[in-house]
């Protein structure tokens, strides 16, 4: 009656589902996944940007290298073209002097020489490349030798070994038809890895403290460095308002750099100066004063100038002001032979490291002094400590890098050669090992003159308008024991001299009068004043018998004073510009003077005449005569120290200073001497060949120095208003 129930309903589609619902946790999870994806993408893009930045830096370095190489090629091409033109002209001029048959042969040979094929060029350049690769392999081997200094890559031929390491085309061969066998199968091009590898080797070869200076800088580093430089510039601008640093007053100052091993470089500033015209004594005075004048040189200027020492604050003195002058016709020309400036790196980077960024010189035929000579092998270095090296360590002169020579010998023919130092150059009796600073005397003004008493007890420092006396026998004493007010308040004292008895002090400076002080009285007092016609005195010397005083005047004259009668007895005339420095021989028979006229002159004190004249290419700022030998050391404005023999043409030229050599003094033993300069350096040298004994760097220009009579102490006066006392360690 009722239908049976359907036990198994027919199969149909799934029941319809409701709308999908997302929970908050699912949404946050999806956001997190998208954020992680974007962060990974950002990190990838950031890495790509850094990679592109590094590639950009590498490309810029390559661009500089290519530019330097192309410019060098251009200069060399013009040079060779000019040489070829001159040689061709010379051949054409000499042809008429040959016989007719010989003329034809020469013409044919010249024409054959002009026919240079591409195959010959490829062959020649291939040989040059092989030679450059061999040189590179030798240098790589030399770098691996223990005890050897890092190799200076900047001195390589840019088209030889350097091109091989950089993966650059070798010279102009990239412009020629290259045969398939151009590249050697065993040499693989390094592409962009060359500069990075060279840079890594450089960073590994320097000390850890200096490694970061030679790494590739990212744009962020450059930006930070720019901000840091702005901050430093603001600090420097504020510091310039003070007169802490004395600036030597040289009109033709140039930034010359010495190849010192530590590679330190001090920037130099040029300051203007004012000139005071001084009248020169031309006629005998009514008091019967003798005036000795040697025959004047042809072309010498008759006008004299007395330089005033002017600085930023219009108060600081410097060396006798350098006056721009036209060389006289018979001035010494540069000697033929080796130019020491070409034998040494001249830029700020330390020796053995690549040079500074290339700067194109103004003259296309003039190579910048800091660039290595193309095609010229680097100089053979010089090692002053060869005697202490073991046999297992090779001498650095066998390598192409290392400490450059700084001492050169000039023979009678005028050629300069590096000096081979003897084994006892830095050892032996009377040769110090170093100097230790033991005291600082805060004078309060720029210290332009210093001297030490005998026995060593007092130090006299001359500044602006006064001389201060210090007792250095008590190291803890920081105050002067007395103050001697000299000259005028605003005039700087340029020289102070003690008589051997220690009872009399003579003071000269930027005034026409010399002050003679009696130190034996209970209170030091001025017992006499000597007045000259010159407005300033630059240097003083005392005869061994203490009877005569010699003063270098700003008008070029050398005044001779009788200290007993306190009168002027004679004037030596010859310098055509201010006389800046002076010294006397131990026997008192000969006087040596240096001047701003680029000359050093010797005078016979018995006969009252000039004996010799030495012409230089730079102004003379300091000199000293060896107490035990016939050697005269001269410090010059161009940073050189030259040691001359009094009677022979031999001389030595020393190159460790980076700026003007402002003072110089021999030790009493005569075996060594010291020099100071505007580069803040105190250098000690071996007599006469100039082996560097020790070196000390101060914080400002070192204007003056003196050595005690027992050779145990050195005193220096500097532009930061203090004097420094050193103990010499033997």
From Swiss-Prot:
It is found in: Nucleus. GO terms for molecular function: CRD domain binding; DNA-binding transcription factor binding; HMG box domain binding; transcription corepressor activity. Transcriptional corepressor that regulates transcription when recruited to specific target DNA by hairy-related bHLH proteins. Maternally required for neurogenesis; in the segregation of the neuroectoderm. Directly or indirectly interacts with Notch and Delta. Pfam families: TLE_N (PF03920), WD40 (PF00400). Residues 296-308, 322-345, 353-362 have a biased composition (Low complexity). This is Protein groucho. Residues 366-382 have a biased composition (Pro residues). One of its GO terms (cellular component) is nucleoplasm. WD repeats lie at residues 442-480, 488-527, 532-571, 574-613, 615-654, 656-695, 697-730. InterPro entries: Groucho/TLE_N, Groucho_enhance, WD40/YVTN_repeat-like_dom_sf, WD40_repeat_CS, WD40_repeat_dom_sf, WD40_rpt. It comes from the Eukaryota. Residues 144-411 are annotated as: Disordered. Ubiquitinated by XIAP/BIRC4. Ubiquitinated by hyd in response to Wnt signaling, leading to degradation by the proteasome. PROSITE patterns: WD_REPEATS_1, WD_REPEATS_2, WD_REPEATS_REGION. SMART domains: WD40. The modification Phosphoserine is found at residues 205, 207, 218, 242, 258, 267. The modification Phosphothreonine is found at residues 326, 328. One of its GO terms (biological process) is negative regulation of transcription by RNA polymerase II. Keywords: Developmental protein, Differentiation, Neurogenesis, Nucleus, Phosphoprotein, Repeat, Repressor, Transcription, Transcription regulation, Ubl conjugation, WD repeat, Wnt signaling pathway. Belongs to the WD repeat Groucho/TLE family. A motif (Nuclear localization signal) lies at residues 227-230.
């Amino acid at each position: 009656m009722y239908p049976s129930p359907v036990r198994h309903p027919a199969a149909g589609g799934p029941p319809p589902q409701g709308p999908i619902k997302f929970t908050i946790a699912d949404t946050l999870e999806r956001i997190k996944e998208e954020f992680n994806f974007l962060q990974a993408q950002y990190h990838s893009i950031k890495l790509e940007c850094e990679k592109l930045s590094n590639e950009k830096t590498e490309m810029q370095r390559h661009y500089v290298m290519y530019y330097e190489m192309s410019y060098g090629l251009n200069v060399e091409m013009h040079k060779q073209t000019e040489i070829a033109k001159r040689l061709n002209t010379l051949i054409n001029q000499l042809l008429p002097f040959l016989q007719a048959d010989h003329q034809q042969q020469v013409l044919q040979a010249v024409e054959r020489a002009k026919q240079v094929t591409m195959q010959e060029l490829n062959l020649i350049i291939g040989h040059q490349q092989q030679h450059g690769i061999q040189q590179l392999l030798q240098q790589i081997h030399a770098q691996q030798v223990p005890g050897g200094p890092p190799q200076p890559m900047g001195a390589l031929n840019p088209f030889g070994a350097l091109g091989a390491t950089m993966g650059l085309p070798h010279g102009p061969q990239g412009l020629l038809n290259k045969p398939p066998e151009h590249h050697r199968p065993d040499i693989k091009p390094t592409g962009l890895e060359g500069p990075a590898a060279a840079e890594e080797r450089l960073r590994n070869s320097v000390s850890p403290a200096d490694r970061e200076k030679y790494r590739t800088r990212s744009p962020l580093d450059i930006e930070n460095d720019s901000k840091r430089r702005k901050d430093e510039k603001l600090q420097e601008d504020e510091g310039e308002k003070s007169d802490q640093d004395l600036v030597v007053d040289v009109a033709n100052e140039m930034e010359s750099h010495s190849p010192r091993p530590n590679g330190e470089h001090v920037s130099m500033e040029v300051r203007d100066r004012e000139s005071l015209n001084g009248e020169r004594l031309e006629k005998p005075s009514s008091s019967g004063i003798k005036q000795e004048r040697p025959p004047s040189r042809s072309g010498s200027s008759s006008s004299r100038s007395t330089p005033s020492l002017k600085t930023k604050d219009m108060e600081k003195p410097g060396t006798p002001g350098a006056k721009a002058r036209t060389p006289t016709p018979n001035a010494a020309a540069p000697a033929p032979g080796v130019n020491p400036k070409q034998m040494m790196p001249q830029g700020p980077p330390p020796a053995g490291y690549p040079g500074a960024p290339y700067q194109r010189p103004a003259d296309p035929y003039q190579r910048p002094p800091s660039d290595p000579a193309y095609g010229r092998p680097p100089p053979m270095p010089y090692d002053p400590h060869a005697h202490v090296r073991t046999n297992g360590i090779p001498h650095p002169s066998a390598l192409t890098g290392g400490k450059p020579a700084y001492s050169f010998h000039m023979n009678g023919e005028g050629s300069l050669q590096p000096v081979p130092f003897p084994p006892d150059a830095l050892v032996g009796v009377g040769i110090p090992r170093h100097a230790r600073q033991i005291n600082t005397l805060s004078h309060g003004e720029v210290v332009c003159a210093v001297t030490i008493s005998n026995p060593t007890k007092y130090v006299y420092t001359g500044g602006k308008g006064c001389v201060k006396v210090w007792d250095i026998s008590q190291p803890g004493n920081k105050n002067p024991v007395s103050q001697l007010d000299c000259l005028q308040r605003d005039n700087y004292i340029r020289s102070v001299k003690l008589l051997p008895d220690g009872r009399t002090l003579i003071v000269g400076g930027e005034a026409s009068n010399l002050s003679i002080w009696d130190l034996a009285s209970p209170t030091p007092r001025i017992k006499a004043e000597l007045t000259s016609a010159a407005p300033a005195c630059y240097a003083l010397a005392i005869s061994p018998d203490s009877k005569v005083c010699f003063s270098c005047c700003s008008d070029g004259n050398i005044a001779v004073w009788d200290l007993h009668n306190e009168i002027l007895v004679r004037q030596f005339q010859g310098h055509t510009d201010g006389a800046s420095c002076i010294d006397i021989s131990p026997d008192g028979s000969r006087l040596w003077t240096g001047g701003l006229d680029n000359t050093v002159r010797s005078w016979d004190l018995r006969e009252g005449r000039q004996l010799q004249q030495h012409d230089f290419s730079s102004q003379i700022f300091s000199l000293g005569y060896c107490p035990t030998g016939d050697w005269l050391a001269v410090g010059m404005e161009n940073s050189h120290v030259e040691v001359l023999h009094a009677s022979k043409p031999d001389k030595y030229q020393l190159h460790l200073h980076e700026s003007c050599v402002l003072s110089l003094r021999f030790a009493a033993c005569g075996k060594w001497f010291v020099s100071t300069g505007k580069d803040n350096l105190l250098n000690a040298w071996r007599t006469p060949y100039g082996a560097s004994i020790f070196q000390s760097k101060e914080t400002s220009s070192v204007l003056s120095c003196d050595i005690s009579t027992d050779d145990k102490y050195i005193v220096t006066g500097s532009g930061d208003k203090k004097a420094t006392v050193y103990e010499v360690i033997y």
